[in-house]
Amino acid sequence: MADLYGLLPGWGRMPPFLLYTGFGWRAMRLGLIQMDVVSGDKERNITHAFELMGKVSHQADMIVLPELWTIGYDFHNLGKNATYMGDGLIQRLSSLAAYTGTYIIAGTLPVKKGGVIRNTGLVFGKDGDIKGEYSKPVSYTHLRAHE
């Protein structure tokens, strides 16, 4: 990798990651967000994640968030903490991607669709549009039987 730094001046402290696109290799800078998620404290986790994304967005081509970064593994409050596809959090992620021109892989979120909550990963393009969505096949419904 040291040789690669010499070939790509201006990369600064964030080392490039090589991605094969089908048209050849492309160097990308990844902003991998690692954070202490406070279980059940959705607002604090979201605020902290956006602070961290703000710090790396000017250097990164793509930002990657961790699994269940909004609520951790707080399955007791899934009903009140689930995200809906059109809600403010989705809009904020979309706006950040578009504003910074950065791809965002939004880790996974508990997303509620049609009365079912699933662990869902979202990919936002540089234009802010959702480019990919994947929900794990197992829902959280069985964990919410006591609600």
Where would I find each of the regions flagged by the language model?
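N-terminal phosphate-binding loop and adjacent alpha-helix
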Residues: 34-52
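Conserved small/polar residues in nucleotide/adenosyl-binding loops
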Residues: 141-147
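Active-site-proximal beta-strand elements of phosphoester/diester hydrolases
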Residues: 28-37, 120, 133
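Cys-nucleophile CN-hydrolase/nitrilase-fold catalytic domain and related Cys-dependent amidase chemistry
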Residues: 42, 53-126, 133
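A short acidic/small-residue loop/turn micro-motif
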Residues: 136-140
